[in-house]
Amino acid sequence: MSQLIPAVRVAATAKPAKSAIIFVHGLGDSGSGWSWFPQLAKQSNIIKNCDSINYVFPNAPLMPITANGGYVMPGWFDIYEFGNPEAKQDIDGFHKSCETLKSLIKEQIDNHDIPADKIIIGGFSQGAAVSLATVALLDFKVGGVVALSGFSPIKESLPQIMNKANLETPIFQGHGTADPIVNFDFGKQTSELYQKLGFKNVKFHTYPGVAHSASEEELADAMNFIDDVLKK
């Protein structure tokens, strides 16, 4: 059940909440690793009415990661080889995490009366991959996607299993050109794949010299994107 999914939940300070952001962390991180974002959003004054946003930062389960010699760490799915888009992928684990994100979306709809089109999903690295896949698999429309340093582990099967509910949904993809973990070209190929599949509002943002992280410029661009989505 969705209420059992471990997450850092930051409730809107202005009631009732009118929108929600669900942001999924990357490998080895936790929900608390991104729980500073609501404060940044408020201080930046970029996102209007940010006090009426529910924030959810889910925690990944612990699992052995093959590419790290089997070391157990928080992960949304196993990684067999870093930086290689052609490497073997943990398809079952990946889909399980997509189901987790779907449950969190439905939690906001069912328990907090947030309209689906006012829910933005997103994430960093593994979390971005899960968010990008989930928006393609959902059978109802959400507000938008923020994918930072993202990729698609299911690029071969996605055309056969995707739904079309979110073809008009705006998607923000940001990627640093110096990323050694998720190669920049892997991110760019994912953006091109989504455009080829019929997603009409995919915007790929390039950040020169940025490694596997989110720069201040990227975060500001993401917040401007969120503001545009939520004010519609």
Swiss-Prot record:
Q: Which InterPro entries does this chain map to?
A: AB_hydrolase_fold, LYPA1-2/EST-like, PLipase/COase/thioEstase
Q: Where are the transmembrane segments?
A: none
Q: What Enzyme Commission number(s) apply to this enzyme?
A: 3.1.2.-, 3.1.2.22
| A molecular function GO annotation | palmitoyl-(protein) hydrolase activity
Q: What does this protein do?
A: Hydrolyzes fatty acids from S-acylated cysteine residues in proteins with a strong preference for palmitoylated G-alpha proteins over other acyl substrates. Mediates the deacylation of G-alpha proteins such as GPA1 in vivo, but has weak or no activity toward palmitoylated Ras proteins. Has weak lysophospholipase activity in vitro; however such activity may not exist in vivo.
Q: Which family does it belong to?
A: Belongs to the AB hydrolase superfamily. AB hydrolase 2 family.
Identify this protein by name.
Acyl-protein thioesterase 1
- Gene source species: Debaryomyces hansenii (strain ATCC 36239 / CBS 767 / BCRC 21394 / JCM 1990 / NBRC 0083 / IGC 2968) (Yeast)
